[in-house]
């Protein structure tokens, strides 16, 4: 199919023509497996629908390509539309490297890109070049559109240099020029460039590139985009049992390269054959004859991430591989407590969320992250005014800050006996998996509540400064609960995520404590305190109560589970220790969303 031509395209700086003479095109990226995309979607894992197999310059001064479509569901749907003649339009993403000014027509300037590098081909719905597309021959000149550059970041789109000496336009020798774009006298172009650059920088910082591009094209101001960005990334309280198609934060789906193995070409059916015990035995013996698949998965993850495993990388999906068989559930005598249902690639996130006390209270889990992450938070409220009919609203300055999340490694050890290693039972596999999940969950809870902030631990909520609180003399009662709720309510915190957390001992005391004398109503009733959900954990100190908006808590997960076998510790019994590593961090967006009550020291 034809992908580009010398058809003039209206751009934000003027008219642009891509030169198609010999030597004008840098083929390095296009001829090394450039992607075939849907609608220039370069960030979603489902955006790539194929690959460019061949690219060449034809005699009619057009770039033509031969592409191969993927067998994924999304690609198959687009391929059927192509075959049926519904999708005909093609676009090319490219980087301009050299550009010259050819002529001016009033305020309109015409540029020729004399050196450029194409790097992707897209099947699009709407574009701008009516001479290229699927199935177009040299004498066809209607119906196709190619959008060049409008889908690209501005830093890609404005990189230009002077024409090389000796280049000619329309047969006439041209002297080198360094002028590329005419600046309007009022500086409007410079302001527009700054607006676009600021929005794109914010989108890049908070992993919201698509939202930023939309804001640029729709003319949003930087302040408007900040508010839009804050709304897009604000965590919401999540139900304890999410539906099949729910996610904790949809906008983080494109950040799952470390967790989702589909991008590596591994299907859910493949993962159902993954055996944790086979992987453990292979690491112990060094013989991967029976664990070739498990080793291939680890190698694929290592290649994709550019890191080496301590032993083997295990994707989160593998924690549920093999659990696809339907057994009687919720029946301990029949293995029901060890059985899960259909595997989903987000199960690790959801089950870890439910295993942690923080998650059960409504904390937000962000998974599949890469590198340090900054989450925006609003530091001050906007100002609103009553206006006359023709009045203008004064400028409102809104302060924004960020919450930093960085990988902190949780390491655990699971003892596996010689006899346990020889078992092939699915229940034994699930037993080891459950032990792994529970260990990560308990450590995450402990880290957020009582982390010291040292030795690669997060700084726990109990040790942070600036958190509202109170003390009680003898027994936590109704008055203390009301005071805590009032402290949190004064911070304008959403009531949807509010709840109590205390120790198991205090839960028992709450069940014996009357709200008021003679009422018969208990402080702790049906796992609620004053209408708010309440939970107890042995992680909490004996005389401590915490109340707050738990949706403000962020649990961040990076990469995959890293496994390493330790044979030395239990060598005498021919057992081993499975050492587990998972990168996690926890933090809260607003400390004032919590109140802590402690028993006063006599």
From Swiss-Prot:
Recorded family membership: Belongs to the HK97 phage major capsid protein family.
Polar residues: compositionally biased ranges: 157-167
Keyword Metal-binding: no
Pfam families xrefs: Phage_capsid
Residue ranges, compositional bias (Basic and acidic residues): 170-191
Gene3D superfamilies: Major capsid protein gp5
Protein's UniProt name: Major capsid protein
InterPro entries found in the cross-reference section: Phage_capsid (IPR024455), Phage_capsid-like_C (IPR054612)
Domain of life of the organism encoding this protein: Viruses
Region Disordered, residue ranges: 149-191, 234-261
Localization annotation: Virion
Function: Assembles to form an icosahedral capsid.
Principal location: virion
Alphabetical keyword list: Capsid protein, Late protein, Virion
Keyword Metal-binding: no
């Amino acid at each position: 199919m034809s992908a580009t031509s010398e058809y003039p395209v209206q751009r934000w700086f003027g008219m642009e023509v891509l030169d198609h003479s010999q030597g004008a095109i840098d083929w390095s990226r296009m001829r090394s497996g450039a992607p075939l995309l849907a609608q220039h979607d370069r960030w979603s894992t489902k955006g790539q629908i194929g690959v460019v197999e061949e690219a060449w310059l034809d005699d009619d001064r057009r770039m033509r390509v031969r592409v191969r479509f993927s067998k994924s569901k999304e690609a198959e749907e687009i391929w059927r539309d192509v075959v049926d003649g519904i999708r005909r339009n093609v676009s090319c993403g490219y980087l301009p490297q050299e550009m010259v000014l050819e002529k001016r027509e009033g305020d309109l300037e015409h540029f020729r890109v004399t050196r450029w590098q194409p790097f992707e081909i897209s099947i699009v719905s709407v574009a701008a070049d009516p001479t290229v597309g699927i199935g177009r021959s040299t004498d066809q000149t209607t119906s196709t559109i190619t959008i060049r550059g409008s889908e690209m970041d501005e830093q890609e789109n404005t990189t230009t240099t002077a024409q090389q000496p000796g280049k000619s336009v329309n047969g006439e020798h041209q002297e080198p020029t360094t002028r590329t774009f005419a600046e309007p006298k009022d500086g409007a172009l410079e302001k527009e460039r700054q607006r676009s650059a600021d929005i794109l920088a914010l989108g890049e910082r908070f992993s919201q590139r698509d939202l930023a591009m939309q804001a640029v094209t729709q003319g949003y101001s930087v302040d408007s985009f900040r508010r839009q960005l804050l709304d897009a990334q604000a965590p919401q309280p999540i139900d304890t049992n999410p539906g099949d198609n729910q996610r904790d934060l949809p906008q983080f789906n494109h950040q799952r390269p470390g967790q989702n193995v589909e991008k590596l070409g591994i299907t859910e059916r493949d993962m159902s054959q993954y055996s944790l015990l086979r992987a453990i035995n292979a690491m112990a013996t060094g013989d991967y004859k029976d664990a070739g698949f498990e080793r291939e998965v680890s190698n694929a993850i290592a290649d994709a991430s550019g890191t080496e495993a301590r032993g083997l990388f295990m994707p989160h999906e593998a924690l549920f591989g093999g659990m696809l068989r339907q057994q009687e559930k919720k029946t301990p005598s029949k293995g029901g407590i060890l059985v899960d249902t259909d595997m989903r690639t987000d199960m690790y996130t959801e089950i870890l969320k439910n295993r942690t006390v923080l998650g059960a209270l409504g904390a937000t889990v962000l998974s599949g992250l890469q590198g340090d992450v900054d989450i925006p938070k609003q530091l001050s409220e906007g100002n609103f005014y009553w206006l006359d009919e023709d009045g203008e609203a004064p400028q409102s300055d809104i302060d924004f800050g960020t919450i930093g999340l960085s990988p902190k490694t949780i390491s655990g050890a699971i003892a596996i006996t010689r006899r346990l290693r020889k078992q092939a039972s699915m229940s034994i596999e699930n037993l080891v998996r459950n032990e792994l999940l529970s260990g990560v969950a308990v450590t995450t809870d402990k880290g957020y509540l009582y982390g010291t902030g040292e030795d690669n631990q997060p700084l726990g909520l109990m040790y942070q400064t600036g958190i509202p609180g109170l003390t009680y003399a003898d027994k936590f009662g109704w008055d203390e609960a009301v005071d805590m709720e009032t402290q949190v309510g004064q911070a304008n915190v959403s009531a949807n995520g509010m709840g109590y957390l205390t120790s198991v001992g205090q839960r028992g005391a709450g069940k014996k404590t009357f709200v008021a004398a003679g009422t018969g109503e208990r402080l702790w009733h049906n796992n609620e305190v004053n209408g708010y959900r309440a939970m107890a954990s042995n992680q909490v100190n004996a005389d401590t109560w915490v109340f707050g908006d738990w949706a403000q808590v962020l649990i961040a997960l990076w990469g995959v589970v890293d496994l390493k076998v330790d044979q030395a510790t239990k060598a005498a019994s021919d057992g081993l220790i499975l050492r587990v590593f998972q990168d996690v961090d926890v933090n809260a967006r607003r400390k004032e969303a919590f109140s802590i009550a402690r028993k006063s020291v006599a």
